[in-house]
Every structure is written in structure tokens, then in C-alpha cells.
Amino acid sequence: MADGNTPHVAIIPSPGIGHLIPLVELAKRLLDNHGFTVTFIIPGDSPPSKAQRSVLNSLPSSIASVFLPPADLSDVPSTARIETRISLTVTRSNPALRELFGSLSAEKRLPAVLVVDLFGTDAFDVAAEFHVSPYIFYASNANVLTFLLHLPKLDETVSCEFRELTEPVIIPGCVPITGKDFVDPCQDRKDESYKWLLHNVKRFKEAEGILVNSFVDLEPNTIKIVQEPAPDKPPVYLIGPLVNSGSHDADVNDEYKCLNWLDNQPFGSVLYVSFGSGGTLTFEQFIELALGLAESGKRFLWVIRSPSGIASSSYFNPQSRNDPFSFLPQGFLDRTKEKGLVVGSWAPQAQILTHTSIGGFLTHCGWNSSLESIVNGVPLIAWPLYAEQKMNALLLVDVGAALRARLGEDGVVGREEVARVVKGLIEGEEGNAVRKKMKELKEGSVRVLRDDGFSTKSLNEVSLKWKAHQRKIDQEQESFL
């Protein structure tokens, strides 16, 4: 935590390792480039996970972490969606946060700034009590942020379920969106998850700024729109890409097995297949994907989890409860042993995406994974599952960074479609076009992080504001001595 007049920022990530990773990278940048100290304040409804501890314990001493007591969610139905559980966890952690800020204030170590993510805006209540500047870190892209900023207006003007809309919604700066592609909580406006999303979005106006994990080359038109001043809209700063800089919590045997296997594959020949830390497939979709990969004849590295009927079922527990290999089609491993490698639950994605044998990534379009692919120039097959991933997929396809696997009438991507899109990416003309676009975006992602780059300048602007507020807090504290 902060000593003396060192600028001090507190960060509250929402539960889930995917929320933590980009904020860790932000903390590193604040430390290395701007001399801040950072305190992570971790809410949860259970003891911290091994993955959380591994990530936080790997950080420099100037980045501290405090785990708040677990929030009591015993009254929350087991069927509650992840957005509801996350929001309630943060909201019910406010008393513990208030106590922590009181202690820090008494010790003259109160942070100047509090950074929360999408579901953490109720922590602004505590920030206001202690005159701490509230900011939002939006971990996804400016396209989805623009949609969310427009959501309260949509809520007022649209009476039906959004999924029932017959025409795409046109929002300035956004890719046209059909209702069924809206972020997951918007698919049922009567569900508590939608009410919590709307509640948090309506509090965005209380922030003094919104930091976005994207960059100008990826979304030039959207960024112009979202940065235009408007009533009740805080300044928006593009500071990305912030991506995982290395592996944490690795299973050493699996790590070396898959990386050594990649070492023996031809350049650009392997399709990496993974649905992130929280995504799972239905049993039928799991089988169709397996058979499609085999039918494609292309090399692949597939990270598998046991199938489930809920796309986000691994969100709070990324380890498969059952043996995922037992669900593979009979004879699949023998049939594909010359060209494929299957690993269970986890793989060192940061290292995999930098490997020269990787020629593509079949992804759930989580924004962390999407950005990791972009900074490494790896072309994508978009296979969104939950959260805002359908909107991410729309953006990635629209800019030419991804091909899209098409759903059948039964809602399943069939084996023939899997084989078609895999072959198209690895060896087809459409794959070559995506590779070319990804090369351009990779170059842009490097450019914006140079000393004179767009994202570097944006974070510089924010850091100057934060340092000024720290000086103000220090002066106020000294006046009481």
C-alpha cells in the first residue's frame, strides 16, 4: 500500500479470473510507467481461489492485495445467473470495504482513486464517503461500451423482449445488432441479471472516467463516437490492449506436453481450440466439434472441459468435475493422434498464442482471449457462448479479424460446418484475408503502446489527474495534523 506521497490506486475486480487478469496488467503499467502503488481489494462469496492467489502472489511488492470477508449469498437461488451473483457479491461487500477505507484513512494511506469494473459500481457509495475519485475499467471493447451507454434509453423505448425485435438496432458507432445478439443479461428482461446490469450501467455517470481495454486501430469509428462529450457520460479513455503477459497456476506436466508437441508441428499449421476459463459446450455440440475437427484433417490443440447444458457453467470453477476425456467420441483420440492433441481443462494460452506453429484460434470470443490473439496476429474462428461474446464476435467479423462458425437450425454447429470453417481459416482464401487483417491489427497494437502512442497518451492523461487528486488528499490529511 501507499507510503508517504506515493500515488495510490485501489482496484476492485469483480469475481472471476477473467476480470482480474486485465486489471493486473493495468496495475503493472501504473507501477512501471507512472510510479503508483496499487492495492487490489478482492470481494468474493467464498475463500479466494488458487488461481487468484497465484496471480496476485506473482506481483511486485508495490502491488498489494486485500481479501474482503466472503459475502453471504446463502439467500441467492442456485439458479441465479453469474451477473446477479457478481453484482450481489460486490454490493454486499460494501460494509467490509467501508471498514477497510476507514482503517486506511486513519493510517494516512487512503487511496486517491478507486477503480471498479462493470459490476462494481455500488462501491462508488463508499468512495464518495471518503472523497476517493471513482473510475470504471471496462474490460471489453468500445463497441459494447457504446451499446451499454445506450441501454437505459433502449430500456425506456422498447416494450418487448429485445430478442423479439425483428430489425437490427442501429446505435451510432456500433456494429448493427440484432436483439438475440445483445449481451446475455438482455435476453430476459424479467431476470434479476438484467436488472443488475441496468442498475450498474445507470451508475456509470457517477464515474469521473471510463478506461477501456481496446485501441484505436481496432475500433476507429466507435472510438470517435464514444469519446464525444455528452450529458451524464464521463470521459472515455482507450488504454488497451492490456493482455496476460504470462502463465499463472500452470500444471507443469500439461504445460510442457502441449508446448513440446507444438515444437514438432509445421509453421502456422495448428488450430488452437479453447473456450476460456468459464465456457462449456452441450454434449451434442461437444461431439459435433470433435467430429468436425477430425473431418477437417487439420492439426489442432484442443483444451476440453466436460460438457454441460449451461454455457457459463465453468465460470466459478474452471476445472471439469468429471473426466472430460470420457465424453469424446469412441476412437476419436486414435483417429486424430497424428494431427491432434487434447488437453484437459487448462493450457498456457499466453505461450500457445505466441508459438510459431499456431495458425488460428477457435475461440469463445471472450475479450481477453480476443486481444491476446490480436497482439500475436493469430486469426480467429468466432464461436461465442455467453456474456457479451456474441457482440465481440460481431465486431471481430466486421473488422475482418475472424470467420464465424454458423449455427444450424437446431442451434448446433454441425460437424460439416466445423470442418468447413477450420479448413477455410487454415488453408482458404478467406483465411488469408483474416491473416492479413490480423497482421495490420498486431502492428497497430504495438504502435498505440509506444511512448507517443494513442493508448500511452490516454493513460498518461488519466495518471496526471490521479496524481493531482492524490496531492489534494495529502494536503487535506496534513491540514488535520
UniProtKB/Swiss-Prot annotation:
<comment type="similarity">
    <text>Belongs to the UDP-glycosyltransferase family.</text>
</comment>
<feature type="binding site">
    <location>
        <begin position="347"/>
        <end position="349"/>
    </location>
    <ligand>
        <name>UDP-alpha-D-glucose</name>
    </ligand>
</feature>
<comment type="function">
    <text>Possesses low quercetin 3-O-glucosyltransferase activity in vitro.</text>
</comment>
<dbReference type="Pfam" id="PF00201">
    <property type="entry name" value="UDPGT"/>
</dbReference>
<feature type="binding site">
    <location>
        <begin position="364"/>
        <end position="372"/>
    </location>
    <ligand>
        <name>UDP-alpha-D-glucose</name>
    </ligand>
</feature>
<dbReference type="InterPro" id="IPR002213">
    <property type="entry name" value="UDP_glucos_trans"/>
</dbReference>
<dbReference type="GO" id="GO:0080043">
    <property type="term" value="F:quercetin 3-O-glucosyltransferase activity"/>
</dbReference>
<dbReference type="GO" id="GO:0005783">
    <property type="term" value="C:endoplasmic reticulum"/>
</dbReference>
<keyword id="KW-0328">Glycosyltransferase</keyword>
<keyword id="KW-0808">Transferase</keyword>
<protein>
    <recommendedName>
        <fullName>UDP-glycosyltransferase 72B3</fullName>
        <ecNumber>2.4.1.-</ecNumber>
    </recommendedName>
</protein>
<feature type="binding site">
    <location>
        <begin position="386"/>
        <end position="389"/>
    </location>
    <ligand>
        <name>UDP-alpha-D-glucose</name>
    </ligand>
</feature>
<dbReference type="InterPro" id="IPR035595">
    <property type="entry name" value="UDP_glycos_trans_CS"/>
</dbReference>
<feature type="binding site">
    <location>
        <position position="277"/>
    </location>
    <ligand>
        <name>UDP-alpha-D-glucose</name>
    </ligand>
</feature>
